[in-house]
């Protein structure tokens, strides 16, 4: 199948969904960008740009905004879901009666669904063993939209879908590397947001560069423990979806999770920090999901547990750091 002949639907018109839509449309592909907010769609249709979430990057002629989910999926084989993880299951449920046996599902969502479920498990439960794929890696939406060099991982349960999707996306400035570890890619994408909040808190408390480096490194260890328990591959940890995305999210202030942590470390109230950022903060939601998973399987994840206590038990960030520093020394 020649993938470029068929339109692709992108469900989710936030900054990341829009950036991916631009990558595809700039290659001449027909792209349908769906948002559930009718006023947002009206704005995009009238202005030819997503001024709410990704301003300054005009839509190519082949990129159209939709609010009607049925219309956005009509005649479409490939669907790319880019909504916050807490909305992922709902979107799958809504699209279920609107798709057919030829449908192939990919997502750029990073996180776990309600009940600490991996996103591919949600898709399999609702839709069966359809061709599915995950796109992940260090990819700030504004830099992708600006056509700055970016590299991501793509993993799929279907070799033809993987080949077609890579052909759709890959270019000189947006490089796509094939990966065969869906579990590892999904778990890395979930944990890195939590660790970005942790490093943001540390920097907000002015604990220094040494502390930031230690948090990233020990955070990678936590990530590895989780991936190992669920059968993911250790190689994924040092790849784009693991270390690559972790370093970017923990160190760049374009990261919403890092900015959220910075605000908390500087003493800003949680709700106020959320309102200031104005878009979904995946780590805020996924801390709860990953924490539950770690508890259930007795996985040692002290950084994740302390972030959870800060977010959900009102633990003072300074106290959380002090408790981590008082932990008994152990082998690396």
From Swiss-Prot:
Q: Which InterPro entries match?
A: 6-PGluconate_DH-like_C_sf, 6PGD_dom2, G3P_DH_NAD-dep, G3P_DH_NAD-dep_C, G3P_DH_NAD-dep_N, NAD(P)-bd_dom_sf
Q: Which reaction does it catalyse?
A: sn-glycerol 3-phosphate + NAD(+) = dihydroxyacetone phosphate + NADH + H(+); sn-glycerol 3-phosphate + NADP(+) = dihydroxyacetone phosphate + NADPH + H(+)
- Binding of NADPH: at which residues? 15-16, 110, 141, 256, 282
Q: Does the keyword DNA-binding apply?
A: no
Keywords of the record: Cytoplasm, Lipid biosynthesis, Lipid metabolism, NAD, NADP, Nucleotide-binding, Oxidoreductase, Phospholipid biosynthesis, Phospholipid metabolism
Which NCBIfam families does the record associate with it?
A: PRK00094.1-2, PRK00094.1-4
Provide the GO biological process annotations: carbohydrate metabolic process; glycerol-3-phosphate biosynthetic process; glycerol-3-phosphate catabolic process; glycerophospholipid biosynthetic process
Q: Is Ribosomal protein found in the keyword set?
A: no
Its pathway, per UniProt, is:
Membrane lipid metabolism; glycerophospholipid metabolism
Q: Which family does it belong to?
A: Belongs to the NAD-dependent glycerol-3-phosphate dehydrogenase family.
Q: Which PROSITE patterns match?
A: NAD_G3PDH
SUPFAM superfamilies linked to this entry: 6-phosphogluconate dehydrogenase C-terminal domain-like, NAD(P)-binding Rossmann-fold domains
Name by which UniProt lists this protein? Glycerol-3-phosphate dehydrogenase [NAD(P)+]
Q: Its Gene Ontology molecular function terms? A: glycerol-3-phosphate dehydrogenase [NAD(P)+] activity; NAD binding
Q: Which GO terms describe its cellular component?
A: cytosol
